[in-house]
Every structure is written in C-alpha cells, then in structure tokens.
Amino acid sequence: MKYLAGDFDVVVIGAGHAGCEAALASARMGCKTLICTMNLDSIALMACNPNIGGTAKGHLVREIDALGGEMGINIDHTFIQSRMLNTSKGPAVHSLRAQADKKRYSERMKHLLEKEENVVLRQLEVIEIDVEDNEVKGVLTKNGAYFTTKAIILCTGTYLKGKIIIGDIIYSSGPSGLYPANDLSQSLLDLGINLRRFKTGTPARINKRSVDFSKMVEQPGDEKIVPFSFIHDKLDKDQISCYLTYTSEETHKIIHENIHRSPLYNGSIEGIGPRYCPSIEDKIVRFPDKDKHQIFIEPEGENTEELYVGGMSSSLPEDVQIKMYRSVPGLENAEILRTAYAIEYDCIDPQQLDLTLEFKNINGLYGAGQFNGSSGYEEAAAQGLVAGINAVLKIKGKDPLILKRSDAYIGVLIDDLVTKGTNEPYRMMTSRAEYRLLLRQDNADLRLTEMGYRIGLVKEDRYNKYLNRKKNVENEIERIKKVQITGKKEINEFLLEKGSTELKKPISLYELIKRPELDYFKVEPLDDKRPNLSDDEKEEINIIAKYEGYINKQLEQVEQFKKYENRLIPKSINYSDIKGLRIEAIQKLEKIKPINIGQASRISGVSPADISVLLIYMERKNREN
C-alpha cells in the first residue's frame, strides 16, 4: 500500500559512482537529499576493473576533485598501487591511474554518505517516477513508500532490466549477481523516454594462490606517488604489484574452436558493447593478425586473494572459460572464483538531455552515468557531479553549470553525449578533446577550482590552498622571465654537459628552459635564488615554460571557438520557419535544441551551410527586434 514517506529537495536513484557524487554535491550545496540503492553493501561498487583513472579518465578524476567532488579523495585513501601513465609522451596525455582496494573504496564512500548531514541513505527499489504537467513530483518504491521531491537524478548503472549472459545461460540480474531493477524501465517508457539496450562485460576473478607469477612480468607502482586530489601534498604507501602476461597460441585456438558458442556471435546478445573495451573473443576475431594480446593480473584489495584478469573479459560458456584462462602463461592452474560474464541493460539516448543533464521534456529529471550511455566509473562520477550541481542550482533559481569543451574533459564528455549522441557505450579518450594541451590533468585545479568555489562545493581552506598554488606558479614564472643567464665559461660548460649549445648572448632562464634537452629541474644549478616550491608547482612551471608556443596557439583557437559558443540561440526559435535549412538539419536541430551556434555546428547532419543560414536568420531577427 502506498504511503507518504517524506519530502526531499533531491532524490538520487542509484548509489554507484554517479549516484554518490550527485548525492554528495546536492547535500553539500545545502539540499535535503535522499539516495536510494537496492543494496547498501554495493555503494560505489567496482563491478568491473579494480582501478580509478588511466588515460583521459585520470583527467576526469582530477577535474571532479577540482570542482569539489569526492572520487579523487576517496581513491587517495584506498589505493594499493599508483602509476603515472604515458610519461614518455607530452604532458597533455600524462594520466594518473591507481589500483583500488575495492572493498575499502566502497566502504569509505558508504560511510561518507552515512555521515553527510543532508543525506538520507536508504535501501529501496524505486519502481515509478511521478510526473505532472512535465514536472517531477515524486518517486514510488517497491515497498509502497512515496517521496515528494523537486528533482530526481537517475543513476541506474547496469541495473535497469539487467540480464547476465554466460554462453547459452541467460538470467535476469544486476552486476555481480545483485538484484536487477526490472520495474523502473516501464515507468520511464510511460513518460515518453526512449530506452535502448547496451552491453558490457567483465573478466573472471581468480585465486592468487593458483597463479605462477614467475612466468609474468612484474608491474610495480611508481616510487614517487602522485595524489589524485589537490588537497593532498604527498602520499606514502607500501604498494602491491600488478603483473603482465599474454594470451598464447593455445588461447586463440580454444576461442576459435568455440566461437560458435559465444553469445556475441550466435545472436544471444542484442545490446551494443563498448568498442574500446572488447571481450577477448571479440579481440581475437577482429584482430586475426595479432598472435598475442596483453593480459594484466591486478589485485582487488589488501585483504583478499582475488585477482582481476584485465584484458580478458568474456561471455563464453564456463567450461570454455576454464580452458581459455588456463592456456595463459602463469595461469595454467588458475582457480576461477567468479566467472566472466556479459551484462545487458537499459539506458537512454543522451540526446534527450540538455547540457545540464536535465531531460528536455521533463523539468527536474536528470540522468547520469551508464544510464546516459557512457561507460566507466570516472565518466559516471563526472556526470553525477554535474547533474547534482545543476539540480541544486535550478532549485535555488541560479544559472546552471555548463562546462564548455574548452573548460574541461567533463565538458567534452557531456557535449559529446548530448550533442553528438552515442550508439555504443561512450568512453573518454584524450583524442576526443580538441584543446587537450590546455586541459591537462596537472592544471585541473587552476581551471576549475574557482567554479567549484562559486557554486559552494569548494570550501575556504581548499580555496586558499588553490590561491596559494596559483600565486606561487605565477610569481615564479614572472621571476624566471627576469633572471638573465650569460655565456660565462662555467655556464657554457654546464650547458655542454647537458647536451645543449653554448650561449652567445644573455638569455632569460625562462627561454633557456624551452630548449628540448633542458627543463626547469635541470637548470636549477644556474638558479641560486629559486624559492621553495612543491613538486607539482615546479612541474606546472616547467610545462608552462616549455610548451608556451603550443599553449598560446590553442588559446587562440579557443577564442575562435568561443565566438560561436557565445552566440546564443533563442529558446523560442522555430527551425521550420528558416528558409534554406535542409530537412535533416531542421529535424536534428529540433531534436537536440542546441543552446548556441557552437553546439549546433557539432550536431551530426547539420552542415556548415546550415549554420550559415541559421546565422543569417538570427542576424535578421536581431535587426527586426
């Protein structure tokens, strides 16, 4: 029987990585927040890989942190190994990655929600969204509890009509054998929301005692640990190694012989899977010229023997999986603790959302994470944070937070989903960001902390720390521009020793650093008045000095980009009235409802000629008004 159970400003449905960030942001900005999860023991569950960060994903975590989110702080408290990736490449693609203690990561996030003053945490299944006159009114749970609310954030992950597939065995389930949410999908369909099926998968978990590490290459953590969160100066930890091995000829033979039993190839799987995280059987079919594939053996925590077999997700039958895993060097006697599986789930076409992550046709209803068609913990957390922030800003009658593509990877992520849409689980990559030299992970705080402070998520002590770092970097840049280095004998000897050329005339230290063989760290012996700076401040100064030319070019590109971004399109515009617009362009523009010319220009099916017609129309209307 239905009963009135309470009133909240914001209700968050789901307590995965998106839901946790959404609820914490909402509560910390002063809104009374209910977060519902089907299992209190699966909060911030790492249902797949036991790590946070990685290429482009590390950028997202740093940005979440700079805006006042929790993911970076949580992994700093619960990591078991840390590595900076892509250090042989330029700073734009340097990405931090940390192995997590999965259980501790989840437990700490749960405890944060339990302690947060404005959060009410409940184990409940929401089965219905109540909407009147295109505005949310409340949610109904399976046990009859009805909660009124001003905003609802859907963070359902892979639970909506979840279906696990292992060979020809198919059953209704959420991830890791958890209960699926089978009723909510119908409520969303009744509201006119378009749903579709996506698929993801996870590899087996094996027992550490059954692994022969002597046949693998050890992958230790970095000696110098770099924190994810800008609030942490240094971290110290006894780290646990990962290991690298490869598939064998026998692995490929087993898969080829049993490919007819793969749900991917016999029609059992309807959902579309992630292009950039294919199953092992998909890799072997798609890349027949490769005789081996990398397999990473990753620990799942300090107090467990479970190991994650990275790079080997599968939906093959269990009997095939056992043979397949045991054909990998070092895994000849592997004991499987959890079978690999594929999972299908309902999600939305994100083009139904606007750039605040609110549904265009339902006031107060937001989506975040895998529900929006993305993949990955970090992508989910970023969307959850933005949805939580915007729900509160709307309730308070304030302007929304809309991050541009030139502001953050989060801006690229949301713009791609909402403007371009996605026909497969969307994964963030550095190649998706046009201005990646400006959107480095090292400067996320310098880019976004001001925004986080203005909206009330970044507190005073954190803000003061940011101001101090900003001032130190700016002051040091100014100082080294004034320090003159002359061609003295001992200086030229030093330069020759470093593989550089002699000085013929005085040069500033700032210009000297630009030489390919030198950097801010190497020229320290020439700089006796150098102030005491932190490692991250020194790194920031080095990047700004060495890459100044490239950075300035991208800044010029951003100025051009902003001209289109600042040309706002009136909400009242009727595209059908615009003569010269192609029918496809009219349909796409009416569907997406872009807020500015920049967004309109990125819609698939809208040509540069259509944009010219639209601009001429807007100019004429402006003159008439």
Curated annotation (Swiss-Prot):
Listed Gene3D superfamilies: FAD/NAD(P)-binding domain (3.50.50.60), GidA associated domain, C-terminal subdomain (1.10.150.570), tRNA uridine 5-carboxymethylaminomethyl modification enzyme MnmG/GidA (1.10.10.1800)
Molecular function GO labels: flavin adenine dinucleotide binding
Keyword Translocase: no
InterPro entries: FAD/NAD-bd_sf (IPR036188), GIDA_C_N (IPR049312), MnmG (IPR004416), MnmG-rel (IPR002218), MnmG-rel_CS (IPR020595), MnmG_C (IPR026904), MnmG_C_subdom (IPR047001), MnmG_C_subdom_sf (IPR044920)
Example GO biological process: tRNA wobble uridine modification
Keyword set, alphabetical order: Cytoplasm, FAD, Flavoprotein, NAD, tRNA processing
HAMAP family listed in its UniProt record: MnmG_GidA (MF_00129)
Quaternary structure note: Homodimer. Heterotetramer of two MnmE and two MnmG subunits.
Family according to the record: Belongs to the MnmG family.
PANTHER family: GLUCOSE INHIBITED DIVISION PROTEIN A, PROTEIN MTO1 HOMOLOG, MITOCHONDRIAL
Function: NAD-binding protein involved in the addition of a carboxymethylaminomethyl (cmnm) group at the wobble position (U34) of certain tRNAs, forming tRNA-cmnm(5)s(2)U34.
UniProt protein name: tRNA uridine 5-carboxymethylaminomethyl modification enzyme MnmG
Gene expressing this chain: mnmG
